[in-house]
A protein has these predicted regions:
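Structured, non-membrane catalytic/scaffold regions adjacent to prosthetic-group chemistry
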Residues: 1-143
Length: 143
């Protein structure tokens, strides 16, 4: 698939920022290939890292995040696999990180293990669309 390289600033909700050169596949191109069902409204990313440890009730404890189709199709939203002309380091989200340049860092899922297209978050963990959203953060973390 075609790739995109972009130099952008990462803004953290904690107040720090940094600039990096990211390369990856535009998420919009991937969505065009899979042809989402009409009822799909959100792109949900499940990640390899666990935030809560094992749960007794069988819930998935892995980090997860979501964006809507407008952000998913934005030209700067990519599934990044390179950072600064090198393979993406584990510390920065390898094997795959979703870069959503119009939103704060907590919306940019690292260690992506799977991608789902969903209509609702109602049955996914806390029902708010992401790990931090379930903890009280806003669902749209725009900058």
């Amino acid at each position: 698939m075609p790739q995109r390289t972009q130099t952008t600033r990462h803004d953290c909700v904690e107040g720090w920022s940094c600039i990096g050169k990211w390369t990856g596949v535009p998420l919009g191109l991937l969505l065009d290939r899979v042809r989402p069902l009409p009822q799909a409204r959100f792109v949900l990313f499940r990640c390899f890292d666990s935030m809560d440890g094992p749960t007794l009730d069988g819930r998935d404890s892995r980090y997860y995040e979501s964006i809507d189709f407008d952000d998913a199709r934005h030209p700067q939203t990519i599934l990044a696999y390179d950072l600064n002309d090198r393979p993406l380091p584990v510390a920065n989200g390898a094997p795959l990180r979703c870069r959503v340049e119009r939103q704060l860092g907590y919306k940019q899922a690292k260690y992506v293990s799977s991608i789902e297209l969903v209509e609702s978050f109602a049955t996914i963990r806390g029902g708010k669309g992401g790990y931090w959203e379930d903890e009280g953060y806003e669902w749209y973390g725009g900058i």
